[in-house]
């Protein structure tokens, strides 16, 4: 049995969970999330907690057991607390500005990048070098942060680019001139 999958998930008072056919619907203060569940997994709501089990005992069902338990846990956490990722822009002349649901990034190229912010995710700027991505869906928040970071990954010599706040960039030593 999956060590993560067999743990019950406690449901907070502010969260309502509904299981219909192969859908798990989680509603909370911040919003509503829906997750499709495979046929090999069953989800039950009992005594104020969610119990994830499996119908079959094959290898795939064992793998999905822990996965769906974690997905449901993240859904509950998302509708109660939400998720956020912070990014920092390093580099001379590198900056970001927000207009409506678009993020314009100047990253040392001749043109600006325009990143359209998808629904379900909000982006906040602190100054013009700090970006905070927030939302209730952990996957969407991480995906948006990764897409913004991929526009200009930090380079190892000067550290210029977009990096996560908790990310450590391994720096390299540049060329050293030979003395004659």
Swiss-Prot record:
Entries under InterPro entries matching the protein: Ribosomal_uL6-like, Ribosomal_uL6-like_a/b-dom_sf, Ribosomal_uL6_a/b-dom, Ribosomal_uL6_bac-type, Ribosomal_uL6_CS
Transmembrane domains' residue ranges: none
Keywords: Ribonucleoprotein, Ribosomal protein, RNA-binding, rRNA-binding
SUPFAM superfamilies: Ribosomal protein L6
UniProt GO cellular component terms: cytosolic large ribosomal subunit
GO MF terms held by the record: rRNA binding; structural constituent of ribosome
Family named by the database record: Belongs to the universal ribosomal protein uL6 family.
Role, per record: This protein binds to the 23S rRNA, and is important in its secondary structure. It is located near the subunit interface in the base of the L7/L12 stalk, and near the tRNA binding site of the peptidyltransferase center.
Full protein name: Large ribosomal subunit protein uL6
Organism: Borreliella afzelii (strain PKo)
Gene name of the encoded protein: rplF
